[in-house]
Amino acid sequence: MHETTPYDVIMAGGGLMGCATAYYLLQADPTMKVAIVEMDPDYTRNSTVLSDGNMRVQFNLRENILISQYGMERLKTFSEDMAVGDWRPQVDFRQQGNLFLADEANKANALAGLALQQSLNCEVEWLEPAEIKARFPLYDE
């Protein structure tokens, strides 16, 4: 007869979201029994590793901006926070930026989002078409 281990939570997938959820559940209640079921135990071919991920703050919803800001702050100390003995996980994150384009029909909504982002100390700016063309000559009108 096989013995079974009862778990409070079983995470299906151990990518970024699965591992983060398990981590924060255990931070909230260290007595909780959490299991992560991941098809790629070496973490060499799972969705997080293979993604060309992007973190951004250009949202029109305050909560989304705050979540992104929190994630960016956590990345700064992630290797130290997740250290096990002398081993430190390697974080290969390179912050670059994004360029979002808006047509006249969506300009007011984009400007409202910009104001919200700036009110939350996001480093974002509005560029007019001529400024975009000067900074990014690959884009043509």
Regions found by a protein language model. Name each.
Residues 6, 31, 49-52, 95-96:
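A structure-centric signal for secondary-structure junctions around beta-strands
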Residues 2-17, 35:
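Beta1/beta-strand and adjacent pyrophosphate-binding region of the FAD-binding site
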